[in-house]
Structure formats: structure tokens, C-alpha cells
């Protein structure tokens, strides 16, 4: 197999540029055009024959547009005789659709996985899937990265002697516990029940947060309804400080503004798995780059080295 070729869709070209800068390779151009009937056409503007092709495209708003674009990129690479096609998908939005929790409901996580493989993907590189079991939906290898090292390196600048990592729900408690171990902190979790996409109820917080420096950790923040509900429960216990952290800062429907307006929230930390428009930035927002981690994973995949070893090493910081 020949050298690496990295292409980016239109979802997050800045991240693809960062990854290529870390790898020391150029970002190959992609042409996306739209016909009068609203159909898309994608052309990869560099040779792919027998090359190790990496396609960078998080599934962010507009999700369906970016998904079709990614499928066409896979198809174009396969048609151009690529040696291997790895989809670098820092955010897989359909990971939320991972179970049949209502009659006659679609299972988007599995369907989109099948579509990517059918389009030509030979491997997937993902970051902090909303439901980790989703990687089992793929019939090709999936390398599942997380951003805990990057987040931990950021929070180590503070005094963590009274820190407690709080998961908004028990489903994310395992990741919160791992993060707490990295920081030498305590861990707590909210008792959450979801009624709709933007309607949640957190009845209590399980764990010690009174007088503590709280770091709320979630995999993603979309509308922010869960975090706002959790903040109400935390205030009842009287934490000393509150900071928010997530991997995917989606911040839909003005969520970033609402969270930044909370006077007791000192900081909102996310990574650049998804683009946050500059006009939405606030003084409390901190965006950490996961480009070095993605680039190292790409390098290891290309060279046939272990990707899981990235997490066996001592955490960053």
C-alpha cells in the first residue's frame, strides 16, 4: 500500500487541516457540487489508487447533508481503487439511536453503519460514541477514541484536592469514574429520567458535592436541558465551584449562551470534534484540540500499530 491521502468533507475542514499539519501531509482537495435538482456530486481531487485514504467528516448539522456527502466520498474513493478507506468520524450523531425503546422505531445507529460499509468504508475511527456498544453495529473494524486525556490535562491546572466529577446520569458514570481516577478526584452521578429530547428530570445527585469543586462531565451537550436540570440539583447541595466539560460541544438552540449565563458556572470546556461558530463563543468557553490524538491514531492505523496503546500510556499532562 502506498502513502496516506487525507480528504475532508465540508463539515469540519479546519479539523482536517489540523490533523494533516500534525501528520506532516497535505490535505487533498475535495470538490462538492450541487445540481439543479438538489442532488450532490463529490469528486476527490487527488490520486487514490492503492493509497491509504482517510476521509474526515463528523456528522454535524446539517447531519443528513453531511452524511450523504460522506457516503459519496467513500464511493468515490472505492471507485478510484483506494487501497483502504478509513472514515474519520469524530462525532457520530446517530450513535444516540442505539436501541428500540418504542414500537416500530428505526435503529439509525445500525442503519447508518451499514450505509457507510456499503459505500466502501473499510474502517472507522470515532471519538467518544454516545453509546459505546454502537461500534458493534459496524461490520468493519472501529477504533473508538476518547478525549479524557485532553480534558484531564486541562483541568490539572487547578487545585483538585476538593474536586468531584459529576456524571449527569448513571449511563455516563463509568466514563466519569475513569475521568475522576485520572484527576485523583471523587465521583458522583445524577439520577436522571428522560421524557423527551428536551425534557429530563434529575431527582437527586448520588455522591458528595457539598463544598466541593464540581466538574460536570458529559459526552455531549446539545440543548443543555440535562445540564441545566443537574445544576438545579447541585445548587441544593452547595458546591464550592462548578465547571462543565464535554467531548462534543454541539450547543444547539442557544445552549451555549444559556449555560454561560449561569453565574455559578465558571467554565465550559469542550473539544473541537465539532465546529463551534465563532459568533457563538463566550468568555467562559474553552475549546481543546483533539487533532493530535486523531493524527496519532491515523499514523498508527497506517503503520499497522496498536491504537489501543494510546490509552495504555500515562495520561497527558
Curated annotation (Swiss-Prot):
One of its GO terms (molecular function) is ATP binding. The lineage of its organism: Bacteria, Bacillati, Actinomycetota, Actinomycetes, Kitasatosporales. PANTHER family: RIBOSE-PHOSPHATE DIPHOSPHOKINASE FAMILY MEMBER, RIBOSE-PHOSPHATE PYROPHOSPHOKINASE 2. NCBIfam families: PRK01259.1 (NF002320), ribP_PPkin (TIGR01251). InterPro entries: Pribosyltran_N, PRibTrfase_dom, PRTase-like, Rib-P_diPkinase. The keyword ATP-binding applies. SMART domains: Pribosyltran_N. One of its GO terms (biological process) is 5-phosphoribose 1-diphosphate biosynthetic process. Belongs to the ribose-phosphate pyrophosphokinase family. It comes from Streptomyces coelicolor (strain ATCC BAA-471 / A3(2) / M145). It holds the Pfam family Pribosyltran_N. GO terms for cellular component: cytoplasm; ribose phosphate diphosphokinase complex. It is an enzyme of class 2 (transferase). Residues 211-224 are annotated as: Binding of phosphoribosylpyrophosphate. This is Putative ribose-phosphate pyrophosphokinase. It catalyses: D-ribose 5-phosphate + ATP = 5-phospho-alpha-D-ribose 1-diphosphate + AMP + H(+). Its EC number is 2.7.6.1.
